[in-house]
Amino acid sequence: MAMSPYIFIVLILIILSMYRERTVKPGKLLIIPLLLLWGVSASFQPAYFHSVLHVAISGILLLIGLACGFGIGKMVNVRIHPETGKVTSRGSLGSVILILVILSLRMAARTWLPESNEMFIAIIHSMFFVPLGTITARNIMLYKAYRRLTAGKVSIQ
């Protein structure tokens, strides 16, 4: 499998975007996983979930994604910005490494599994559940940190 330069550009953009400090918007934390869920559900054929193997693999990959997302969510730095008073978040080095490992495993799955195998087809189709679980769990952790920080924040007028 030849690595194109686009993959390296995407990896660099992911690293830079995770290190950038952003304002946490609680409404956006809910909308993004819902849009991703809609995209994942729209990409499947209705007959896909009739096989127990496909349902089991999809469930396992969703659990793996949730576990990775909770790990990433625990590593994200969330604070109240001293100048603006807004809640901001910034990714840590550990969360960047975990995202890169997940992306590498997704790209390597095609070379590790033979294409004629039913397990290969089920895993490739279910790979969408890993980012769905990761983003959902990360956003849950961000929302919990946001609520914790804003609950103790007192507005002085």
Curated annotation (Swiss-Prot):
Keywords: Cell membrane, Membrane, Transmembrane, Transmembrane helix
Subcellular location: Cell membrane
GO cellular component entries: plasma membrane
Membrane topology: Multi-pass membrane protein
Transmembrane segments: 29-49, 52-72, 93-113, 117-137
UniProt name for this protein: Uncharacterized protein YxjN
Gene that this polypeptide is encoded by: yxjN
